Design a protein with these regions (language model features):
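Extended, charge-enriched "interface" segments that sit outside catalytic cores
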Residues: 2-140
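Glycine-rich phosphate-binding loops that contact phosphosugars or nucleotide phosphates
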Residues: 126-134, 140-287
Length: 287
């Protein structure tokens, strides 16, 4: 059932296939036809266009055959049903449930996982709306103007990429309420550069660590906490945690609020969980 790609006969065919020259592929009328054909309609009037990728009909056919050899659709169906797909760590893979449900209910330890993720999204929505409309203010009584996410790896890269991708849209449509910033480097000069450019009295911080023990993230938290205290501010009044329910950060009075994720959502896929949902909802609104 599970076979490495380089063990598949069709993978060798792919390696031997000729890579198309995009400069030639996109020229003239044939290029215009390629742009039209290599486009897939998606939701909200958007399209995924792959005309500028180094593929052609021959490569697409080989990729389809490789997907068939690997039983890709069957494996995807098993992922949707909550079977153990992460064989290395013996875990389910459930990031898709933060976006929608295409399969049957996934129950773990008596808990409906889709319901759990929706509950966390509701908490994030309510909190972000309260921050954005001024119901929850900074300790000074002023509205929060900025949000800083403290994380590393998937807790940083995905949310950061989505924020940068949406920033211009948010500004153009008057959706950007809190400017977002990110601290991941354990070099204190990096964090100091971010913090020195902000009005700390109106800045909210999000600490992201699934285990609650990530050394690099906790090191940055301590640095930020010291920075705030030196400015006469109380970190507990300006910091929220995104973590697991069993983490030492959960329901900790050192944080203004806590939002939860779990081991079934890997870091690189966590942008639509509370990991990315909190900072993006604060910046652009929950919708």
């Amino acid at each position: 059932m599970w076979k490495n790609l380089d063990e598949c006969s069709l993978f060798r065919d792919l390696q031997e296939a000729q890579i198309p020259d995009l400069r030639q592929c996109l020229k003239g009328e044939s290029g215009a036809n390629r742009i039209e054909r290599y486009s897939i309609p998606m939701a909200a009037g958007m399209h995924y266009n792959y005309a500028a990728k180094q593929v052609d009909d021959t490569l697409l056919s080989l990729l389809q055959k490789l997907a068939d050899e690997q039983q890709l659709i069957l494996k995807y169906q098993r992922l949707l049903s909550g079977e153990e797909i992460n064989t290395g760590e013996h875990r389910k893979v459930l990031h898709h449930l933060t976006r929608g449900q295409l399969g049957d209910d996934v129950i773990y330890n008596g808990k409906n996982m889709r319901t759990f993720y929706l509950e966390q999204q509701k908490k994030v929505r309510e909190f972000s709306e309260a921050i954005r409309n001024g119901s929850i203010t900074a300790p000074s009584g002023k509205p929060f103007t900025d949000v800083v996410q403290i994380g590393i790896g998937g807790s940083d890269l995905g949310p950061r990429a989505l924020y940068l991708a949406l920033k211009a849209w948010g500004e153009r449509h008057n959706k950007l309420k809190l400017r977002a910033h990110f601290i991941s480097n354990v070099d204190p000069d990096d964090a100091a550069a971010v913090l020195s450019a902000l009005d700390l009295s109106t800045t909210l911080f999000i600490l992201v660590s699934k285990s609650g023990t990530t050394l690099e993230t906790l090191t940055n938290e301590r640095f930020v906490g010291q920075f705030l205290q030196e400015a006469g501010l109380n970190p507990a009044k300006q910091m929220v945690a995104v973590t697991s329910e069993s983490s030492p950060l959960a329901n900790n009075p050192s944080y203004l609020a806590s939002f939860y994720m779990d081991d079934f959502i890997g870091g690189r896929y966590s942008s639509t969980s509370a990991c990315g949902g909190a900072v993006l909802s604060l910046a652009f609104g929950a919708d």
